[in-house]
Amino acid sequence: MTQPNDAAKPVQGAGRFDIWAPEAGTVTLLAGGERYEMGRRPGNGPADEGWWTAADAPTGADVDYGYLLDGDEIPLPDPRTRRQPEGVHALSRTFDPGAHRWQDAGWQGRELQGSVIYELHIGTFTPEGTLDAAAGKLDYLAGLGIDFIELLPVNAFNGTHNWGYDGVQWFAVHEGYGGPAAYQRFVDAAHAAGLGVIQDVVYNHLGPSGNYLPRYGPYLKHGEGNTWGDSVNLDGPGSDHVRQYILDNVAMWLRDYRVDGLRLDAVHALKDERAVHILEEFGALADALSSEGGRPLTLIAESDLNNPRLLYPRDVNGYGLAGQWSDDFHHAVHVNVSGETTGYYSDFDSLGALAKVLRDGFFHDGSYSSFRGRCHGRPINFSAVHPAALVVCSQNHDQIGNRATGDRLSQSLPYGSLALAAVLTLTGPFTPMLFMGEEYGATTPWQFFTSHPEPELGKATAEGRIREFERMGWDPAVVPDPQDPETFTRSKLDWAEASAGDHARLLELYRSLITLRRSTPELARLGFADTAVEFDDDARWLRYWRGGVQVVLNFADRPISLDRPGTALLLATDDAVRMDGVQVELPPLSAAVLRD
């Protein structure tokens, strides 16, 4: 059931069937096996244009329904469908979000600053691959010290398994994960465990199968595409309704499902030339809902533009978002622990790049990018942005999964190198994000997988993936077929690893680092001006200060000794670390956190 500006409000088992179909000549509702002719909704204002209504149809929960446009015989699913129990091509089913009896009345939410995020994919996080099964791991995550769980997209897609970025029904939760009721249970359980939930959402494109939005109206800009297909119509004719559709989806997650924030996928692909960018509207809506609900709500943008305007307040022409990803941190860490310098890693081949990121947030803040062949980014105004607004990681779903074989750092690097990456991520000035399994050095890959039922689409996806890496010099024989079910199965975590050998040792280090971060305010609370960095590229060491806390890292394959060791050893990644009043000694591939 769809009602303009109202999709995110609980229906409480009643309502009416409304649909926006401005180009249709006739619209028929098929509900509960009966047909109802719809009429144009009364009203002369722009908000009423193109809307059809069937006020006499039976309403309530668990009614199967769809729409027939211009005499069609096959009904289309609702663009705002909450449930698709038989798949994205089938009838929609009504769902009453108000039926869930929430148990989280005492939940006050969490602020981004000072928090640690854990990114996970429901389908591969547990053997069962469901929301209910993932809820069984919440105590583990709370014990690790996590504050926010960030879920990869859960909206409905065609097939049984997918990363989630091929979603076509933004208001529906994938039935294979348990559907919308399971999602509510998961959020409720997360809050009971003291964990916030951030939902990854995709508003820059729709998937290749099951996208019926163009049948209803000008949701897309045909011929104006991005990497994934036609762009969403944010600024053309009819875009007022399209924008409201998206804003209602934002409100649905934050209000109906009580999530604590959204991760906004690839906002650089949101083509919006209107005076008020839709990201600004997102920020204003989140602030309003935060005031209404009495808890913080966090919007985090994924952007490769290195543009701090995303974070600046709206009253100074910013978008007012709480955070954005910083790929530069990932690249600098990856190069210095792995030695890879190809492709977009080429500009980060020194400890100097890592030092600049730690000091300034971005490496490319107006500097020349050899990978792009042009200057890139702009500097951050330190008086307007706290370092915690930058979300950083040493691994994430993109940076692992978009490698040819989906290999993690832990599949090729020793404990010492993984420990260096962990220390940089969890003691640096930014908000750290872990990718599922990283904390124990998972050796299961995270590969690109799909399950398109259409043979031609599946074949095209697999061939395109192989061609992409063949152009980069990879042997096509080593690139996994995304349509092979084994590619999905291989990507599931093996939780038995977490208790064995160096896996258990690394897991204990992550717990200790998160505990130290929480108990040492300088690590998470100080601003950009409170970070100082020294390094020696030839000797391969780097150290930085956050107020009265010093972090020393040895990237070399030989021991080092440095002066000014501080007064107390707070944490070491290796038992062979030694310090006295004169020097601190670090074995190869090790780090220490010191109190000055």
From Swiss-Prot:
Annotated GO MF terms: 4-alpha-D-(1->4)-alpha-D-glucanotrehalose trehalohydrolase activity
EC no.? Answer: 3.2.1.141
Which keywords fit this entry according to its UniProt record? Carbohydrate metabolism, Cytoplasm, Glycosidase, Hydrolase
Which residues of the sequence carry a binding annotation for substrate? 263-268, 327-331, 397-402
Where is the protein situated, by its record's location annotation?
A: Cytoplasm
Task: Report the superkingdom from the record.
Answer: Bacteria
Q: Which family does the similarity line name?
A: Belongs to the glycosyl hydrolase 13 family.
**NCBIfam families found in the cross-reference section:** trehalose_TreZ
Indicate what this protein is called per its UniProt record: Malto-oligosyltrehalose trehalohydrolase
Q: Which organism is it from?
A: Rhizobium sp. (strain M-11)
Q: Which gene encodes it?
A: treZ
